[in-house]
């Protein structure tokens, strides 16, 4: 916990950053696309570097590293960026790497963010480049994210004479969450000033998505991904013999009622058109079959796509918990932890960028999708500056389905890698060429 002085100092620093950004003149909106010569240069460079980029992706897949432990991954990234002539900063937020590509022409700075960490999953794919690390796997596609960002850096560094501004490549650790007791991820990168020096005016990211076919991308304007909060509940009853339940207070029965009634928040307490998920994912209680349990512990997650709704959830949950426990004569302890806000793709920024995306990939390959209830800490960047995250299709064309994210069988089609690079290059160049970015708009301020 910060001291009062340290907290005040941090708040002043953030206020200065906010004022510095918002006092800059808003960049003019444009819906232009790149000229033919620049488009051809991107394609030539993509063809030239494609095999090396795929090689990097496979190396990363074979050598996954967990959150805040991405040591070798960071070394590889830093060495590649340095070889390209970028200004490289290592050890950001622990293992993070930041590469700054300065264009030859004056202009604003935009960023490309990629996450680096893997998951504690044993890979079950029979691939020549499957994970070599027992119990660790790139099952969420961060190996693709990293290789795509590196590929984008390769191409744009060769086109720096065309860059009307700068590109900051942010390679982030711990998107999946830092280990208990540690800081990490987007929050720590922002805290350490990754959006400063030079000030970043807009930021891009992508995430692989197995529901979409390789060669396509998916986008949503406005709220794109959900908030993510956790809750912890301990119900305290009174133990008794299983044959004499009237002498105890059954914590398991009470927990069952709580679990059931929490779902009435979604179905009865809130506007049914609002997307809300309340999931109890863990329950522990009891010691043997003939003893009334005196304690049950519950843990779960809450997801929303609306900031106002998110604010209401803890109170609605505790009202149900309190009422039921009192009616049983039990007690409880309830802890609600806010984790991530919803991820907001600013609509004006998205609309300004869509022509470039469609020009790069083709009109019918840029698909509007529904918001999803998964969460991403890229949302923290999107709270600060205009942001655009989109889905990159990785399902093999012709296949009706693919293994989902976080599956031991997750196997994205590598043909998506050049698609992601092409999309990122067009977005970044379009943002700098036509200065299609926005002054800072906080989604939170729009909700209040």
Language model segments and positions:
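Bacterial N-terminal signal peptides that target proteins for export
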Residues: 1-16
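Acidic/His- and Gly-rich active-site-bordering loop/insert found
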Residues: 34-137, 147-164
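Divalent metal-coordination and catalytic microenvironments
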Residues: 60, 99, 112, 142, ...
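Histidine/acidic-residue-rich, glycine-tolerant segments that coordinate divalent metal ions
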Residues: 127-137, 144, 161-282, 287-291, ...
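Metal-dependent amide/peptide-bond hydrolase catalytic core
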Residues: 34, 83, 256-448
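Bacterial N-terminal signal peptides
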Residues: 14-26
């Amino acid at each position: 916990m910060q001291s009062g002085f340290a907290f005040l100092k941090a708040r002043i620093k953030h206020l200065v950053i906010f004022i510095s950004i918002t006092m800059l003149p808003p960049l003019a909106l444009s819906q232009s696309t790149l000229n033919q010569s620049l488009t051809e240069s991107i394609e030539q460079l993509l063809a030239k570097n494609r095999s090396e980029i795929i090689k990097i992706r496979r190396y990363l897949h074979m050598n996954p590293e967990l959150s805040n432990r991405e040591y070798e991954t960071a070394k590889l990234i830093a060495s590649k960026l340095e070889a390209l002539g970028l200004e490289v900063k290592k050890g950001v937020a622990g293992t993070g790497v930041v590469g700054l590509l300065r264009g030859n022409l004056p202009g604003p700075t935009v960023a490309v963010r990629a996450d680096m960490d893997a998951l504690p999953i044993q890979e079950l794919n029979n691939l020549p480049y499957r994970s070599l690390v027992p119990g660790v796997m790139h099952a969420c596609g961060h190996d693709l994210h990293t290789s795509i960002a590196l590929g984008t850096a390769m191409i744009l560094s060769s086109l720096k004479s065309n860059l009307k501004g700068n590109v900051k490549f942010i390679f982030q650790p711990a998107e999946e969450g830092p280990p208990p007791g540690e800081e990490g991820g987007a929050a720590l990168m922002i805290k350490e000033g990754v959006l400063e020096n030079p000030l970043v005016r807009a930021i891009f990211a992508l995430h692989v998505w197995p529901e979409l076919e390789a060669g396509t991308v998916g986008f949503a304007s406005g709220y794109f991904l959900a908030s993510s909060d956790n809750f912890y509940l301990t119900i305290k009853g009174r133990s008794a013999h299983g044959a004499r339940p009237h002498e105890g207070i059954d914590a398991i029965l009470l927990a069952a009622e709580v679990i059931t009634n929490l779902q009435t928040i979604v179905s009865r307490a809130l506007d049914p058109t609002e997307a809300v998920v309340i999931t109890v994912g863990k329950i522990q209680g009891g010691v043997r079959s003939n003893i009334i349990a005196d304690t049950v512990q519950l843990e779960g997650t809450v997801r929303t796509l609306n900031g106002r709704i998110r604010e209401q959830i803890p109170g609605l949950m505790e009202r149900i918990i309190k009422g039921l426990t009192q009616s049983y004569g039990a007690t409880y302890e309830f802890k609600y932890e806010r984790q991530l806000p919803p991820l907001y793709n600013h609509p004006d920024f998205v609309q300004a960028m869509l022509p470039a995306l469609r020009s790069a990939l083709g009109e019918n390959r840029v698909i509007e999708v529904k918001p999803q209830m998964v969460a991403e800490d890229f949302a923290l960047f999107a709270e600060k500056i205009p942001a655009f995250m989109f889905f990159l299709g990785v399902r093999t064309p012709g296949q009706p389905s693919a293994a989902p994210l976080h599956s031991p069988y997750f196997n994205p089609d590598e043909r998506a890698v050049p698609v992601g690079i092409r999309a990122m290059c067009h977005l970044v160049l379009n943002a700098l060429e036509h200065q299609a970015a926005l002054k800072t708009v906080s989604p939170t301020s729009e909700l209040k």
